[in-house]
């Protein structure tokens, strides 16, 4: 949604002050390292532990502050003089985002939880810009899907595939997020075979509730959108999603699987995405696909998030909530 132009940096200059919540976490820390290389912004590292925030901030040339999402008394001091807040933690409600919009502070978020992003869309800020669907998935996958959809007269469906290596070191929050969705009793049971580029071949993908499929269905003229996940090991993929189906809703098995995923370390740190868009063009049925391949999911997510965020900083600020592909 668009609600007119947003304000300039609060300093009155072209220099922005960017506060990264969760800035010393696995993805947030990598984003901070990338943004710290820019000479046109001031970086603030924020988190619940002020000592960790200060120590990490010193290592990247920024400053650290305490910000606890559960303690509203920390919000105003931490956000004083801030132009942008880049959120690298999942939230349970809109209190903090509403606070930012009331202050005219701009907002970006790397979460992959559609329920929260839909709630942010509903706030429709008039003085702030919000950038959501940031990173790899959502983020790059949205852009890939939009690119494919733009080449068709009518889009019938969008299939998004994510392929992860088991040699990667994923953050605890990311593993917990994925385990929650694999063992979700309401998880879509559909399975799709999809081709990945760069020699990865065809893979069997299992549905996972990433937000990209939902935001694309809301913002692009498509009949359907779907996101699935596979791991580099076909055996591990079948075993994990088989457990998710057999023990759907079991907190115990969810926790056991999360522990196994955290400790399991074999294969490569592969991180790939494939997007297939099918539909009609000039009266003929056509399909197009786009592939991406990288290594180390946290690093890829951070680099893409920083790049997408930097693109917004370099352009005009438009109030309202915008997905990356918009």
Q: Where do the protein language model's features map onto the residues?
A:
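Rossmann-fold NAD(P)-binding glycine/threonine-rich loop
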Residues: 111-130
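C-terminal helical cap and adjacent loop that interface with cofactors, partners, or active-site loops
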Residues: 266-326
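Conserved Rossmann-fold cofactor-binding substructure of NAD(P)-dependent oxidoreductases
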Residues: 68-82
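N-terminal Rossmann-fold cofactor-binding loop
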Residues: 46-50, 68-69
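N-terminal Rossmann NAD(P)H-binding glycine-rich loop of SDR-like oxidoreductase domains
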Residues: 19-36
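Active-site-lining helix/loop region of Rossmann-like oxidoreductase modules
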Residues: 21, 150-278, 283-287, 299
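ADP-ribose/adenylate-binding Rossmann-like module
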Residues: 99-117
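N-terminal Rossmann-like NAD(P) cofactor-binding module of classical short-chain dehydrogenase/reductase
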Residues: 83-89, 107-109
